[in-house]
């Protein structure tokens, strides 16, 4: 699954995910994007600056199917503010996982 979240919610999310033991790792990437939030306009030294792409974080987590709904609920509870710009969660299947170090596959590789 991928979750696009506000940058200031990362520590809350990390704490929530580690507290319940559902997730043993995740990948975090800085990304830019826009949706309903649309960006903002500010003035710097009298110059109008329009920011149309907002800084967000992309969280990538791979899990067994049985844990997906629980992980989604933890993510929502940890990062939801109720305001435009909270983000999105995308869930897609993963065909195969291989841990490079041990060659373990699928659930054992998670």
Predicted regions mapped to residue ranges:
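Positively charged, small/polar-rich N-terminal and surface patches that mediate targeting and assembly
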Residues: 1-110
């Amino acid at each position: 699954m991928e979750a696009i979240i506000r940058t200031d919610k990362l520590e809350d999310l990390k704490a929530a995910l580690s507290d319940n033991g559902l997730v043993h790792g995740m990948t975090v990437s800085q990304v830019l994007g826009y949706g309903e939030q649309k960006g903002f306009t500010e003035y710097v030294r009298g110059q109008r600056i329009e920011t149309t792409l907002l800084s967000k974080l992309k969280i990538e987590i791979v899990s067994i199917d049985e844990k997906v709904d629980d992980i989604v609920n933890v993510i929502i509870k940890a990062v939801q503010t109720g305001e435009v710009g909270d983000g999105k969660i995308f869930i897609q299947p993963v065909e195969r996982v291989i841990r490079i170090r041990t060659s373990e596959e699928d659930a054992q590789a998670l």
